[in-house]
Amino acid sequence: MELDDLDLSGSWPLDQITFASNFKSPVIFSSSEQPFSPLWSFSETSGDVGGELYSAAVAPTRFTDYSVLLASSESETTTKENNQVPSPSWGIMPLENPDSYCAIKAKMTQALRYFKESTGQQHVLAQVWAPVKNRGRYVLTTSGQPFVLGPNSNGLNQYRMVSLTYMFSLDGERDGELGLPGRVFRKKLPEWTPNVQYYSSKEFSRLGHALHYNVQGTLALPVFEPSRQLCVGVVELIMTSPKINYAPEVEKVCKALEAVNLKTSEILNHETTQICNEGRQNALAEILEILTVVCETYKLPLAQTWVPCRHRSVLAFGGGFKKSCSSFDGSCMGKVCMSTSDLAVYVVDAHVWGFRDACAEHHLQKGQGVAGRAFQSGNLCFCRDVTRFCKTDYPLVHYARMFKLTSCFAVCLKSTYTGDDEYVLEFFLPPAITDKSEQDCLLGSLLQTMKQHYSSLKVVSETELCENNMSLEVVEASEDGMVYSKLEPIRIHHPAQISKDYLELNAPEQKVSLNSDFMENNEVDDGVERFQTLDPIPEAKTVKKSERKRGKTEKTISLEVLQQYFAGSLKDAAKSLGVCPTTMKRICRQHGISRWPSRKINKVNRSLTRLKHVIDSVQGADGSLNLTSLSPRPWPHQIPPIDIQLAKNCPPTSTSPLSNLQDVKIENRDAEDSAGSSTSRASCKVNPICETRFRLPTHNQEPSRQVALDDSDSSSKNMTNFWAHLTCQDTASPTILQHKLVSIKATYREDIIRFKISPESVSITELKQQVAKRLKLETAAFELKYLDDDREWVSVSCDADLSECLDTSAAKANTLRLSVHDVTFNFGSSCESSEETMMCL
């Protein structure tokens, strides 16, 4: 059905809605009881309405005759007295002034027109909910209000007609009565979800229709009339695909409303500031070390840091000033909240980066989620299943369900470096561990490991970890929406010691940490393991024993023998030496090789210079591999001390010429990448590296941690900005990095796109953004794969994969071919009525 063919000046008979027999409309009223809204007295001529933007005509929407008026929930509610007025805190605009409402409607219509121009051809439905008075009750309705609809969006068009039959009571207290628009209107706060299908039918009464018409990402924003500080309506954005990052949409709505002298919740862009605080820098370095050790030791998918937000005074809607922060969720107004952006984070599973992005947009108040409860109590807190929270108690619950994150542990710490500053460390346990005893065992070992790495940190509540056991708060959400907490004893386990200074080597079968003595003395005993793998799970211990039995085979292969096979792939080398690839990786780790130099190098197309660079950049047990036949001068593996003052004068850039830095940068990558393998990445926001000209020293020097923290950059995933500044200085024989462009040819279904990138500066995030922009996709909705030398499609999920991919492509040609694959999410539903259950099938 073409939208231009719809007769919007007439009625919307219920028989046009094909699903009417399958659902009970929560708001059904007769034509005689049609609520009057002055907005309906405003009409536009057909010539003023362009495209898919519509506004109701003078005649109100007509519904089939029914004798009762039901509230937004499916149960009948008692009608309030006719003379009841809403609470002044709601900020409802008085209905006695039709002219004012006509002006508001005209502004909203124009604002949606601006929004439509900014979104282009996106599949999005934007509709307005406005307050009206019906039988003495104040309700929100979208009937008779302007809306905008993307092209070829029949499902959204049908969902729009469904929304016309709904009204949400502003007098109610329950979520079912208020609905999503009602909650936003009453609280004057935005609400959004990556997928409405994560709501329960009580929280979202249109859930059955959303399932039927594939409605997913939804955002609702309050609209204010600035001169009178009144909430005049709600703008609801509806999409047919999952949505993680809503900041661009909020910005577009803000600009559209500002153009017509209206406003909504704003993104408060704070100025770029540099925090040259050595104490805070040291505290974050210690926190990042703990996150890294714990995640790699126990295979945790994600660990991150929350801190109280830096507030600033902003003009409040009711007059005066209140404190706010950078989130566009205005719930932080005047309250203490926490933010996780620009702080230490460690991600093992690359697929949960979307959850990390969502955390950067949401701020948690005291008591919200596990981190909020730990912040409130200043102690330790644990929840076995955060997906059972409601959205009010944990705003990120829908994202936790999307990314299948369940068990969560948080602890509130403070550092002697920073006085009273508080840091909340949040750890998500592996989703596969669901047994209570296994969770307790893992938690006990985790606590002991953290204790071993505490230097300046301690629990805010002064709780000390006992030798054998301790108590922590365990919270649990019940089916009735209540949250209960109790103290439970946790037995402390005693894992083996891990050195504080280490360089992590990422392999799928075993995570290991090298001793600091290895990097300091540049030597290692052949065949002797100077590290241990810590894992409290019994199954992992069995694997560990079997690996030790093969130690004799590993001792027989020396570093000199390995060097002879660097030109080929790891698989070929393993086959030639008579060992399996897994054993080959362990042999490499014993010699200090964190990454195999190359896949199968095409000696014809790759010059001797490039081969020399690849081999020389591999760090062995004796530092860089000094192959005199190819290289007269080895590459150093450490950098000189860095001065903060010099770093301020360096121009920003996006890449670092040195990647293997122990105390400066932690990046774990698999020695031999494979599709679907997990990747580990640590991040802590710092200033970018200066990369113009720099001196390469020929002697070892201790790296310095005197760097300036950048608290403003919101991109938490750019590993090239991590813990480094290089001194900008001219030299007699400078090393100049040569940049050349690589053509990207990506195929998605029947579409093919082509563009060029700089291999020296591009990251996986930037590459996915370029692909998403050209194919009009969400970055979280697809993954990239490339064809390797073995003619296998390999996933590109992190910067390490991209670097390997570019190396492979450079050995063949200057064109990199990628394949774009959709990422599917498994959505659950909680339909209560039999009719909704039918539609879920």
Curated annotation (Swiss-Prot):
InterPro entries: NLP, NLP1-9_GAF, PB1-like, PB1_dom, PB1_NLP, RWP-RK_dom. It comes from Arabidopsis thaliana (Mouse-ear cress). Gene3D superfamilies: Phosphatidylinositol 3-kinase Catalytic Subunit, Chain A, domain 1. The keyword Cytoplasm does not apply. Residues 649-682 are annotated as: Disordered. Residues 651-662 have a biased composition (Polar residues). Residues 539-624 form the RWP-RK domain. It is found in: Nucleus. Probable transcription factor. GO terms for molecular function: DNA-binding transcription factor activity; transcription cis-regulatory region binding. It holds the Pfam family GAF_NLP. GO terms for cellular component: nucleus. Disruption phenotype: No visible phenotype. This is Protein NLP6. Residues 741-823 form the PB1 domain. Keywords: DNA-binding, Nucleus, Transcription, Transcription regulation.
